């Protein structure tokens, strides 16, 4: 096996680049001749072109250099007609802007405070209404005194009866038993209220 001759290969590559390739007809079935097999055939060139346009060496070099150095962005794209003078100005500028000492300083600055007029006001909801927040005159009770003592005792009795039978299964309670218990408590409270009054008058 013969050793690889780099110099001759380089000369052949330069010769291929210097010679423009000829255009071929798209209707020609054997555009490349009989020397190429069917597996090696390629699509012919465009019929309107007389010769292929070779890439510019400076454009290829600058595009490859900017791609490898990660300097190409959406705002910095090298055109096909770029020259070495354009790259000499833009590439160092992009590198210096990326590696600038001012970027960490800007990132470390304190963020601006938002204005009070821009921020929306948070409405605090009202507290829920409970029995503790309701006033006492809602229940119709009066202040305790000597004149309205029986009415006060009767009101306390009604409240106690309501609290006693306020159960989840209160619908199953017999109405007759409820009435009997109501009459018994009513008579008991009135007897306890009137007995001290009668004893006070007798004395």
Curated annotation (Swiss-Prot):
Transmembrane residue ranges: 89-109
Main location: membrane
Keywords: Membrane, Transmembrane, Transmembrane helix
Membrane topology reported for the UniProt record: Single-pass membrane protein
Organism domain of life: Eukaryota
GO CC terms: membrane
Subcellular location, record wording: Membrane
Something else known: Partially overlaps SPS19.
Protein name: Putative uncharacterized protein YNL203C
Organism: Saccharomyces cerevisiae (strain ATCC 204508 / S288c)
């Amino acid at each position: 096996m013969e050793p690889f001759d780099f110099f001759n290969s380089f000369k052949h590559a330069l010769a291929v680049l210097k010679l423009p390739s000829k255009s071929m007809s798209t209707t020609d079935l054997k555009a490349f001749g009989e020397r190429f097999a069917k597996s090696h055939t390629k699509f012919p060139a465009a019929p309107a072109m007389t010769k292929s346009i070779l890439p510019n060496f400076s454009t290829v070099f600058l595009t490859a250099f900017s791609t490898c150095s990660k300097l190409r962005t959406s705002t910095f794209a090298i055109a096909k007609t770029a020259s070495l003078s354009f790259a000499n100005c833009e590439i160092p500028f992009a590198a210096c802007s990326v590696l600038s000492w001012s970027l960490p300083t800007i990132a470390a600055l304190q963020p601006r405070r938002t204005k009070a007029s821009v921020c929306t006001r948070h409405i605090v909801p009202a507290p829920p209404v409970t029995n503790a927040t309701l006033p006492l005159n809602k229940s119709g009770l009066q202040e305790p005194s000597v004149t309205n003592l029986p009415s006060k005792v009767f009101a306390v009795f009604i409240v106690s009866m309501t609290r006693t039978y306020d159960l989840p299964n209160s619908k199953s309670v017999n109405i007759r038993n409820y009435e009997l218990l109501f009459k018994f408590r009513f008579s008991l409270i009135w007897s306890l209220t009137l007995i001290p009054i009668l004893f006070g008058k007798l004395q």
